[in-house]
């Protein structure tokens, strides 16, 4: 089931700026291992769901997965072949604004090798560079550069 807000105050939002690092959500709070963003980007609800499915399938329903991001920002698109002007387009989907250093996913209840591979598979579904972090060593970690 795709992640979408139940209701929003405004259907259309400004794009906003993605300057600097994340203010919150920089530390592992629930599981033992996490996936940290090294870049700022919009992550769509479909990308989040694809990453979740990849992790749970690899872990064969073992362990627990926490999704620390939620797509609460709508983005709009005008139809194909529509001329410029005449207002903002219709809402086309939902995105989560992820800044660098944000922990996006957490895993618990599995060994480190399984968690590392599950989060690596999840990172291939995302449009940003990520880093595998553990609760004990949140300062360092291993990154997938590209």
Swiss-Prot record:
Taxonomic path: Bacteria, Bacillati, Bacillota, Bacilli, Lactobacillales
Entry-linked PANTHER family: 50S/60S RIBOSOMAL PROTEIN L16 (PTHR12220), LARGE RIBOSOMAL SUBUNIT PROTEIN UL16M (PTHR12220:SF13)
Pfam assignment, any one: Ribosomal_L16
InterPro entries assigned: Ribosomal_uL16, Ribosomal_uL16_bact-type, Ribosomal_uL16_CS, Ribosomal_uL16_dom, Ribosomal_uL16_sf
CDD domains on file: Ribosomal_L16_L10e (cd01433)
Subunit structure of this chain's protein: Part of the 50S ribosomal subunit.
Name by which UniProt lists this protein: Large ribosomal subunit protein uL16
Keywords associated with the record: Ribonucleoprotein, Ribosomal protein, RNA-binding, rRNA-binding, tRNA-binding
The organism's place on the tree of life at top rank: Bacteria
Function statement: Binds 23S rRNA and is also seen to make contacts with the A and possibly P site tRNAs.
GO molecular function: rRNA binding; structural constituent of ribosome; tRNA binding
NCBIfam families the record matches: rplP_bact
UniProt-listed GO biological process terms: translation
